[in-house]
Every structure is written in C-alpha cells, then in structure tokens.
C-alpha cells in the first residue's frame, strides 16, 4: 500500500499529475482542492495517497493533506460514489460540500457532473451525521508552506485554455466550460488554478 509520495512535480494538468521519484514517474488523479495548492513544476511535492483497485484498473489518488484524503474516503463509502466521482465532487471547496450536505442543499450538489438527485440524496443521508464534527484545516501548499503564486506566470490564453481543459476533464461539456471561464476571466488572474476555482464557484454556487 502506497500511503505517501515525496518527489518532484513534473506534470500538473487537472485532474492528472505526475510525481518523479528517483527517475520513476507516478501518475495520480487529484481533486481541485489539491491542485489549488500545488507548487510550480519541478518543485518538491509531498502527497498523501489512496490506492484504488477495481476489476479493470488500478489508480493512485493524491491529496495535499490527510484530511483531504479522509474526506475522499468518506465519499467513496457512499453507495454509488466511485473514486472518480469523488474527485469530481471535490471540485467544490470542502467547506462548501460540507455545508451543502449539512443544509440538505440538493440544488448545489446535483450541479456536479455525474451527481444526480439520488446520489445527492445518498450523500446527504449517509454523510450528514459523520460531518457534524468535521473540522477544516488551514490551507497550505504541498510543500507545507502557505500558498504562494508561481514565479513564472503563463500567458492569459494559456491560463484560459488550461482552465477550460480542466473543467472538461472534470465532466463539464466544452461549451459549459468555455462560458464559465469566460464569465470570470480577468487580467489580474495569473494562475489557471485560481481561474478554475472561480469558474467552479460560479457554476456550483453553494
């Protein structure tokens, strides 16, 4: 069982990333809560991991901290929620997901790609009691430091393209992704992660 990886971040294209450890590249899927806090490429990264095995595949999932991983594991215990759907659900801020569940907010939950009314209802029923004592930890990046901007800012077109690609990978239609990104695009935004976060908040108001 692989519980944690420490290495250099060599691929960062939501929801996929790769960590190089002594010349071996580990492919992982990660929720947006992790991508928001990743360092720049080639920097050292520490990720807590979950190894999911099914009849047809084996997949590593990476998380900034153990609390994110714990929340992911809570999600996949819900009837009908698999690991990839859990990653999609965690495109919402953890605080927002918890609040939606505790407040029975079906309307927000069903806006997540792949989550229908029945799945949203199961999330609320099966997780509500478990989340009543949930504590959210302060945001830090994957090196253990406070979140900081990348030193080399990509072009605005590249940021927009990366944000749209990430939303499509999360299950949104290309037209939906393009419109959502266009609504929140600003010259002041210098990271695709920030643009994705704003677009998701606009698409899934909690």
UniProtKB/Swiss-Prot annotation:
SUPFAM superfamilies listed in its UniProt record: DNA helicase RuvA subunit, C-terminal domain, Nucleic acid-binding proteins, RuvA domain 2-like
Region: Domain I, residue numbers: 1-64
This protein's GO CC annotations: cytoplasm; Holliday junction helicase complex; Holliday junction resolvase complex
Superkingdom of origin: Bacteria
Cellular localisation: Cytoplasm
Protein family per UniProt: Belongs to the RuvA family.
Stated role: The RuvA-RuvB-RuvC complex processes Holliday junction (HJ) DNA during genetic recombination and DNA repair, while the RuvA-RuvB complex plays an important role in the rescue of blocked DNA replication forks via replication fork reversal (RFR). RuvA specifically binds to HJ cruciform DNA, conferring on it an open structure. The RuvB hexamer acts as an ATP-dependent pump, pulling dsDNA into and through the RuvAB complex. HJ branch migration allows RuvC to scan DNA until it finds its consensus sequence, where it cleaves and resolves the cruciform DNA.
Protein name: Holliday junction branch migration complex subunit RuvA
Source organism of the structure: Teredinibacter turnerae (strain ATCC 39867 / T7901)
């Amino acid at each position: 069982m692989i519980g944690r990886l420490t290495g250099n971040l060599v691929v960062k294209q939501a929801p996929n990333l790769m960590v190089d450890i002594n010349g071996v590249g580990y492919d992982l899927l990660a929720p947006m809560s992790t991508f928001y806090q990743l360092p720049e490429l080639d920097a050292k990264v520490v990720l807590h991991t979950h190894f999911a095995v099914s009849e047809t595949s084996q997949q590593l999932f990476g998380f900034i901290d153990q609390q994110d991983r714990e929340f992911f594991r809570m999600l996949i215990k819900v009837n009908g929620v698999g690991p990839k759907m859990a990653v999609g659900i965690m495109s919402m801020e953890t605080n927002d997901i918890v609040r939606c569940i505790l407040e029975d907010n079906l309307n927000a939950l069903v806006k997540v790609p792949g989550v229908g009314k029945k799945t949203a209802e199961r999330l609320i029923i099966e997780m509500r009691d478990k989340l009543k004592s949930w504590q959210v930890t302060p945001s830090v990046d994957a090196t253990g430091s406070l979140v900081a901007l990348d030193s080399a800012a990509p072009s605005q077109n590249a940021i927009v393209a990366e944000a749209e690609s990430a939303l499509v990978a999360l299950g949104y239609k290309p037209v939906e992704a393009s419109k959502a990104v266009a609504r929140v695009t600003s010259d002041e935004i210098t990271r695709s992660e920030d643009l994705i976060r704003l677009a998701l908040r606009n698409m899934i108001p909690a």
